[in-house]
């Protein structure tokens, strides 16, 4: 494919800072090559990389400057499509661009994250503080004001970038601004009074963390939780309706029994049945009535059958169905959003001389801004991979794959099949035999047998251990035998496959890690290093290798590994809810729970602490539930986790209620409902991921789901010379052409006319979804095209009514 070196003019031009149209280039171009009248709206005066068509600095009126502006704007559009940013937040002038670039770099993201974490961690030092971390009021209030000032600076940069109108339209930013104002007022009041007051609004500090760029997964989770709420609330109301009906019925049936405290009042009936829904008080809640009338058990059996086994499972089914629909709609929305972003970028990259596609010159300019760390060789390989028709220009159809292809990592394909192919014949035969051995089924099943025997041996050894010191000062012979076998296996695989191929497998990395830890455990036993004895306990991890034997187990484990990043964001989402409830709990319930605090309640024994003499010794009877308190943020987190597990959670609730009022139960019940929502979403997410993978495997039985995506491209020597000549004419010697020079020198050294490169990347769920919904995707594209055509007609009909100044255009007119 030839590389064009001639100059051209952008079909769409952006404006300079003053808002005027750029001057026509004085290069002898004809009228058809002059800039069009529908140019852009801002200029870029701080471009770090000059255009390929210029040897150095270019004036604002030159074609090179116009291209540089278009390159950066096109790159911004691609980033907005990738990050799912709305196009109405696109920078509209030079000042907005400067603020946009400042707000979209990792230093700014780290500043956002550090500020949010500082505000959250201040709860460790503010009253009620963790004893070891307590700070003076002046110190923590000053730190809070400093962090809030940083947030003000962040919002000012966003205001400069977005403009006042767009800033007000951005809901999350307005919520963050409102919380910032409240936090500012409270911090100043604390600093002036030198005294902390009730600050429930500290629970809203989480918004600063949620708004961070690095917490995009948390924002998606929260959005899905809110989107799943309508059907969830419908089933929840049905659940509460039956609960109230049964509470009224239970009150009339069991309140005459004076020994039954669970149904003495209607309030107690509702609370008892709410707790019964979690099974935390069963069968205790049934026993007083059951002792008087055995038929009373029917009431509780029917209630649990309806509420726990039917409605709760119905709740999960409804949320799962809603979650599936949300995931599909989210994929469709993001897919069309990316497609629109690509169309915006494409319109900025085509030229007046070549409106049919993007030349390599324009593509290279785009990639300098979109992927600045990508080398010149990788840019050209990306262009080649996109160019399906092998023509000098990229069509819009080819350019639609930019996100998938730009993520590939390129490496030269080795001519030899194995790492040892160039060794002397004797060594080659030895290593080839080892390669055949480690790839054979017999070797693999032998290692599975060794792992199984090792597991049984560890189990027998554990059964034979008695209490006390579990670690002998002498190294067991079985440990040496199995570790030797694993070490030999590791050596054979590295020798037969080569270090690179060996470490490219996730299972091999796991085997290597477990073997290394087993060796460290051997050293800990041999050298009597007691603090490191815990490493020995990791030996049973080898048993996980047995899961590779069955395909279903492999699918489960692969799904689990795929879910880990998303599960981390879901865990962080749950921690955010924990933080908010912990702050509220500290403000209302701090210091009210202590030993012997609840002697008048039904759970007094759980909080009782007393000692008495039995014979000649003193016996201490201690109820440990007083440790479940809200005296500081750490204790609150532990207490909330115990409430999440729900075992005996009502004891904590009743202990707090006995010291405050019955309204305190609303806090605990609300927390249970919120955690039930989050946990249901987590379960629905796991089910959706597993079911999706199973359906994909059934639909695409011949495809390799786990192999990742690989693309192969060949570069000829003539192409390399042309690309290098292009770079020399444009910028002279440049560091990003080093790999191109290395490739060319390698071709000359081995007298090759071409070289093959492999592009690899891991397969994402988006890739699986593209294949899973490929029939529907074409319908989505057609529907999207019809909507764009309708918008284009509306824009053209409204154009005469509102005359635009010459050379100006709105963002929405870039691509309709």
UniProtKB/Swiss-Prot annotation:
Keywords: Calcium, Calcium channel, Calcium transport, Coiled coil, Endosome, Glycoprotein, Ion channel, Ion transport, Lysosome, Membrane, Repeat, Transmembrane, Transmembrane helix, Transport, Voltage-gated channel. Glycans are attached at residues 599, 611, 616. It catalyses: Na(+)(in) = Na(+)(out); Ca(2+)(in) = Ca(2+)(out). GO terms for molecular function: identical protein binding; intracellularly phosphatidylinositol-3,5-bisphosphate-gated monatomic cation channel activity; ligand-gated sodium channel activity; NAADP-sensitive calcium-release channel activity; phosphatidylinositol-3,5-bisphosphate binding; protein homodimerization activity; syntaxin binding; voltage-gated channel activity. Highest expression found in the heart and kidney, and lowest expression found in the spleen. Signal peptide: none annotated. Residues 1-112, 156-177, 221-234, 316-444, 501-503, 550-573, 692-816 are cytoplasmic. Residues 17-64, 782-816 are annotated as: Disordered. Residues 134, 199-200, 256-262, 287-294, 466-479, 527-534, 595-629, 654-670 are extracellular. It is found in: Lysosome membrane; Endosome membrane; Early endosome membrane; Recycling endosome membrane. It comes from the Eukaryota. Residues 263-286, 630-653 dip into the membrane without crossing it. It is a multi-pass membrane protein. The chain crosses the membrane at residues 113-133, 135-155, 178-198, 201-220, 235-255, 295-315, 445-465, 480-500, 504-526, 535-549, 574-594, 671-691. Residues 50-63, 791-816 have a biased composition (Low complexity). Residues 769-796 form a coiled coil. One of its GO terms (biological process) is endocytosis involved in viral entry into host cell. N-glycosylated. Na(+) current is inhibited by ATP in a MTORC-dependent manner. ATP sensitivity is independent of PI(3,5)P2. Probably regulated by Mg(2+) ions, cytosolic Mg(2+) selectively inhibits outward current while lysosomal Mg(2+) modestly inhibits both the outward and inward currents. In the absence of Mg(2+), NAADP readily activates TPCN2, with properties similar to PI(3,5)P2. Both current elicited by PI(3,5)P2 as well as NAADP are inhibited by tetrandrine. GO terms for cellular component: early endosome membrane; endolysosome; endosome; endosome membrane; lysosomal membrane; lysosome; monoatomic ion channel complex; recycling endosome membrane. Belongs to the calcium channel alpha-1 subunit (TC 1.A.1.11) family. Two pore calcium channel subfamily. Each of the two internal repeats contains five hydrophobic transmembrane segments (S1, S2, S3, S5, S6) and one positively charged transmembrane segment (S4). S4 segments represent the voltage-sensor and are characterized by a series of positively charged amino acids at every third position. Intracellular channel initially characterized as a non-selective Ca(2+)-permeable channel activated by NAADP (nicotinic acid adenine dinucleotide phosphate), it is also a voltage-gated highly-selective Na(+) channel activated directly by PI(3,5)P2 (phosphatidylinositol 3,5-bisphosphate) that senses pH changes and confers electrical excitability to organelles. Localizes to the early and recycling endosomes membranes where it plays a role in the uptake and processing of proteins and regulates organellar membrane excitability, membrane trafficking and pH homeostasis. Dimer. Interacts with MTOR; the interaction is required for TPCN1 ATP sensitivity. Interacts with STX7, STX8 and STX12. Interacts with JPT2. Found in a complex with LSM12, TPCN1 and TPCN2. This is Two pore channel protein 1. The lineage of its organism: Eukaryota, Metazoa, Chordata, Craniata, Vertebrata.
